[in-house]
């Protein structure tokens, strides 16, 4: 059996945390031969609820769960962490502007970035799930001196999976037959799910669906899926978000399938003309614990326009965060 790895999870008593932790402990994220130590972070007022989650984790008697810690101190939760899933974030309340949300979450992710830099492993892999995820990841890496910014990522895997599911439904195929789906940009309504490179059973997706469906139905459905779930369920996506987080880390750690890629939001290094520094979703492949942006894809005018709109939104968020003194 391998030596255990340490996985820190914030917001651990929340809805996503509850859907996430048991699957990590069962080996679904890092493999059935990889023991894990879970280091769970919550705010003081949620510690009682977290105690209950810890009891349930113990009661599952997972063979791969090598240790369990619950705390309200980021420096304890992130100590020697190999992976950090930053799920906890302040939710948007009625009457709140996005700027207000950035300010409240800015404080959380500033503190967590600093704590990661201070106590986590130097090669810790960080996934930000808490929204606004892309800009929260930016704040975290800008406040984590000594850690590689490339190891800070934000989750667009849920958008990627939603896009695959919608295309599969439309074409009457299984999601496993769909390859090379791409989501560009921000995890927000400006995201751009790109079908120009996608394949269904080896055939170009746009041979099977028409442009009108793509533009008028597919793009808005994927972009607004989160809101549709809130409307139907009275609560935001939890199980599907947890599933996406597991797949994001699994593929990053264990590698992407041959001949395919996934979508991850990562600090831009200027790929495809996207401004450097913003955390932007790209198509990526991963191998041996390192990811690479897929380069050389042809970008047409339709795609370029949408890629620029979502990049501009992220630049605006970065400016707001700078004005608030968070980076």
From Swiss-Prot:
Q: What is this protein called?
A: Malate dehydrogenase
Q: Which SUPFAM superfamilies match?
A: LDH C-terminal domain-like, NAD(P)-binding Rossmann-fold domains
**Pfam families cross-referenced by the UniProt entry:** Ldh_1_C, Ldh_1_N
Which GO BP terms, alphabetically? malate metabolic process; tricarboxylic acid cycle
Q: Which gene encodes it?
A: mdh
Say if the entry is tagged with keyword Transcription regulation: no
User: Which residue spans adopt a coiled-coil conformation according to this UniProt entry?
Assistant: none
EC number(s): the record gives 1.1.1.37
Binding-site list for substrate: 92, 98, 131, 162
InterPro entries referenced in this protein's UniProt entry, alphabetically: L-lactate/malate_DH, Lactate/malate_DH_C, Lactate/malate_DH_N, Lactate_DH/Glyco_Ohase_4_C, Malate_DH_AS, Malate_DH_type2, NAD(P)-bd_dom_sf
Q: Which family does it belong to?
A: Belongs to the LDH/MDH superfamily. MDH type 2 family.
Query: Which keywords does the record carry?
Result: NAD, Oxidoreductase, Tricarboxylic acid cycle
Binding of NAD(+) occurs at 11-17, 105, 112, 129-131
Q: Does the keyword Repeat apply?
A: no
Question: Which GO terms of the molecular function aspect are on file?
Answer: L-malate dehydrogenase (NAD+) activity
Biological function: Catalyzes the reversible oxidation of malate to oxaloacetate.
In this protein, the active site sits at 187
Subunit composition?
Homodimer.
Q: Which HAMAP family match?
A: Malate_dehydrog_2
Q: What is the effect of changing residue 190 to I?
A: In strain: F428; produces a 2 to 3 times higher enzyme activity
Enzyme class label: oxidoreductase
PANTHER family recorded for this chain?
Answer: MALATE DEHYDROGENASE (PTHR23382)
> Which domain of life does the UniProt lineage start with?
Bacteria
> What catalytic reaction does the record list?
(S)-malate + NAD(+) = oxaloacetate + NADH + H(+)
């Amino acid at each position: 059996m391998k030596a255990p790895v340490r996985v820190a999870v914030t917001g651990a008593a929340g809805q996503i945390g509850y859907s996430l932790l048991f699957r990590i402990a069962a080996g679904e994220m890092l493999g059935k031969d990889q023991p894990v130590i879970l280091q769970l972070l919550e705010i003081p007022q949620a510690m009682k609820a977290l105690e209950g989650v810890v009891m349930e984790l113990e009661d599952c008697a997972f063979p791969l769960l090598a240790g369990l810690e619950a705390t309200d101190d980021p420096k304890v939760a992130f100590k020697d962490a190999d992976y950090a899933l930053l799920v906890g974030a302040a939710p948007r309340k009625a009457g709140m502007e996005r700027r207000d949300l950035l300010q409240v979450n800015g404080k959380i992710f500033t503190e967590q970035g600093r704590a990661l830099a201070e106590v986590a492993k130097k090669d810790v892999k960080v996934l930000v799930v808490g929204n606004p995820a892309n800009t929260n990841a930016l704040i975290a890496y800008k406040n984590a001196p000594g850690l590689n910014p490339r190891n800070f990522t934000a989750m667009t895997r849920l958008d990627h999976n939603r896009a695959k599911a919608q295309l599969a439904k439309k074409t009457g195929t299984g999601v496993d037959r769909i390859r090379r789906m791409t989501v560009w940009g921000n995890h927000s309504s400006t995201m751009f799910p790109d079908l120009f490179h996608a394949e269904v059973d080896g055939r170009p997706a746009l041979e099977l669906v028409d442009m009108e469906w793509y533009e008028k139905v597919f793009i808005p459905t994927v972009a607004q899926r989160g809101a549709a779930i809130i409307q139907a369920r009275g609560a935001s996506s939890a199980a599907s978000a947890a599933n996406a987080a597991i797949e994001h880390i699994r593929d990053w750690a264990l590698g992407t399938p041959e001949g395919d890629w996934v979508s991850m939001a990562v600090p831009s290094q200027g790929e495809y003309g996207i401004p450097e520094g913003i955390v932007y979703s790209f198509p990526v492949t991963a191998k041996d614990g390192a990811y690479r942006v897929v380069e050389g894809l042809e970008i047409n005018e339709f795609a370029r326009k949408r890629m620029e709109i979502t990049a501009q939104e992220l630049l605006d968020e970065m400016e707001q965060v700078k004005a608030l003194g968070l980076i």
